[in-house]
């Protein structure tokens, strides 16, 4: 495990729940808090049945995957993965010059509101699937959380609260996520 206080690798069952939220067929995907690319790897390997339940297929294996990661140790890990392109090092400073069909992430819980606001700002057309500390949604006591609550309401965002999501994770915590 890396020595990083904000790095909580996303458990596979939680990644699967996130993937199940995807409604479209993205071709370009960004994980702006990529860590070791667990979400991207799971998306590439994710398989599902066709609508007639006759055969299994992998709908996201040919997507173009981009990542942003601030931790230099994690950047070194990402650099060794040929299926992901590390395009920047700090999502909150990222210019948004690229266009993506999907932004999917588990950002640091202490900056989740700022990360999701940035994702909303740079998403021109497509979907956003984000994992946040539930308190970020339930307790909008800061300016950025209030702005996030307003912008989510304007977009009729679908929010699901998941208790004990990190109970059996590589790095455990009892935080509820949304």
PLM-predicted stretches and their roles:
Residues 1-178:
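Class I S-adenosyl-L-methionine-dependent methyltransferase catalytic core
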């Amino acid at each position: 495990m890396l020595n990083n206080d904000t790095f909580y690798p996303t458990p596979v069952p939680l990644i699967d729940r996130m993937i199940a939220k995807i409604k479209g067929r993205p071709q370009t995907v960004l994980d702006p808090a990529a860590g070791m690319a667990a979400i991207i790897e799971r998306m590439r390997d994710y398989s599902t049945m066709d609508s007639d339940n006759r055969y299994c297929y992998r709908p996201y294996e040919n997507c173009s995957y981009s990542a942003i990661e601030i931790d230099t140790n994690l950047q070194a890990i990402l650099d060794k993965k040929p299926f992901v392109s590390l395009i920047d090092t700090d999502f909150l400073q990222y210019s948004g010059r690229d266009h993506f069909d999907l932004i999917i992430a588990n950002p640091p819980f202490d900056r989740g509101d700022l990360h999701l606001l940035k994702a909303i700002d740079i998403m021109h057309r497509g979907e956003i699937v984000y994992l946040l500390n539930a308190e970020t949604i339930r307790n909008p006591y800061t300016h950025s959380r209030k702005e996030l609550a307003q912008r989510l309401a304007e977009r009729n965002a679908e929010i699901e609260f998941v208790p004990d999501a990190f109970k059996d994770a590589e790095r455990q915590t009892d935080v509820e996520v949304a």
